[in-house]
């Protein structure tokens, strides 16, 4: 059973991860059921009733800052009694997932909690002068949540360190997979990708691409630095509440909106360099997709990117506290004659991620399920 704080139609890292896990569990013949936030009077778009052949049980939700938050409900116990899973997988537990973990522990069902969202940093950002105080309170809540799990999985070494530093017990590392067939350097030769490049770079500009939510927590204000880098053009893929502000700050940039599947892969194929700005990423899935597409990556030297980018080999890391550091990291990679360097970095970036397929990562996840089941059996004994 998977209890998730986010699911379709919302598109984000939590949803993508859960969907890929379900697809690969189906391919291995496992049985599963999903509990997810459903529709509400304020958010009427439907949550699917099934995914990858598995039933999806929706619970009442309320909107919070454009996110659906599933309300804790005794429905979870009812579903648990009926389904009787061998293990419960809780994706990014914070509200709905807490109820899932509590119910699993009460019924003696082993549980694996997947830590995916740096909620303390997000809360700090939106709490003004009380930011540090509220962040500490968030960590106390996270510790209380994850103490109920038999195993907590962190997506990166930075996240693993944060969890351990805040006394979260029983933590292990589990990364994320990438579809290296969809995100592939050959997309660059696709006629539709070539047409997109001609439209975006009519004068041969070097295209600097960003993919992700257009929202304050992504710290996209840093992109203003890049507007002054000659011979380049920014291309942003994604939607969010910051789009109107960014369009005014970046009048020369191209905004492609939300893209999925092959259209997203072609967008990566059109880029020459991938840039990321946020410092609160527990992993950084779009960085991994860019690497699979054969792109060098420039990202902050903080959080998930530390695992994904090797300086001077697969891209560059910049100091997010130093004004102008992003532009300084980008300039050498877009200078005349730098195409060969970008190509070499992109090839090495792809070589390193190509084996991180979702099938391989779900095999690791199933091993973690077995570990949690063994730990639960020992604690009962």
Residue positions per predicted region:
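Conserved acidic donor-binding segment of nucleotide-sugar-dependent glycosyltransferases
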Residues: 311-312, 316-323, 332-338
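Short hydrophobic beta-strand element within catalytic cores of glycosyltransferases
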Residues: 296-299
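N-terminal subdomain of nucleotide-sugar transferases
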Residues: 1-57, 358-366, 370, 377
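Donor nucleotide-sugar binding/catalytic pocket of nucleotide-sugar-dependent glycosyltransferases
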Residues: 36, 139-194, 202-203
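Aromatic "clamp/platform" in nucleotide-sugar-dependent glycosyltransferases that forms part
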Residues: 279
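Conserved donor-binding/catalytic core segment of Leloir-type glycosyltransferases
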Residues: 197, 201-231
């Amino acid at each position: 059973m998977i209890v998730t704080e986010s699911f379709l139609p919302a598109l984000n890292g939590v949803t993508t991860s859960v969907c890929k896990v379900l697809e690969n569990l189906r391919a291995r013949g496992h049985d599963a059921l999903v509990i997810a936030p459903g529709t509400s009077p304020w958010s009427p778009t439907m949550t699917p009733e099934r995914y990858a052949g598995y039933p999806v049980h929706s619970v009442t939700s309320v909107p919070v800052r454009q996110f659906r938050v599933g309300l804790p409900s005794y429905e979870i116990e009812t579903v648990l009694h009926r389904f009787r899973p061998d293990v419960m997988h809780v994706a990014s537990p914070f509200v709905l997932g807490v109820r899932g973990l509590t119910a699993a522990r009460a019924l003696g069902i082993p549980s694996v909690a997947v830590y995916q969202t740096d909620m303390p940093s997000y809360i700090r950002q939106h709490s003004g002068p009380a930011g540090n105080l509220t962040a500490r309170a968030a960590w106390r809540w996270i510790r209380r949540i994850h103490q109920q799990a038999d195993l907590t999985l962190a997506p990166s070494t930075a996240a693993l360190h944060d969890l351990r530093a805040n006394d979260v017990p029983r933590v292990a590392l589990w990364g994320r997979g990438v579809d290296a067939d969809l995100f592939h350097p050959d997309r660059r030769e696709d006629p539709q990708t070539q047409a997109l490049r001609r439209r975006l770079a009519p004068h041969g500009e070097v295209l600097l691409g960003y993919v992700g939510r257009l929202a304050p927590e992504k710290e996209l204000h840093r992109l203003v630095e890049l507007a002054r880098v000659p011979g380049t053009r920014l291309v942003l893929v994604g939607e969010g509440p910051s789009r109107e502000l960014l369009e005014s700050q970046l009048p020369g940039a191209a905004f492609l909106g939300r893209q999925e599947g092959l259209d997203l892969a072609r967008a990566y194929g059109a880029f020459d360099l991938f840039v990321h700005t946020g410092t609160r990423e527990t992993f950084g899935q779009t960085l991994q997709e860019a690497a699979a597409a054969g792109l060098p990556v420039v990202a902050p030297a903080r959080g998930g990117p530390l695992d994904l980018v090797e300086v001077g080999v697969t891209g560059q890391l910049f100091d997010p506290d130093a004004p102008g550091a992003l532009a300084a990291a980008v300039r050498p990679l877009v200078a005349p004659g730098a195409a060969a360097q970008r190509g070499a970095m992109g090839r090495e970036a792809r070589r390193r991620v190509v084996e991180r397929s979702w099938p391989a990562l779900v095999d690791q996840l199933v091993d973690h399920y077995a570990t949690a089941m063994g730990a639960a059996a020992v604690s009962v004994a």
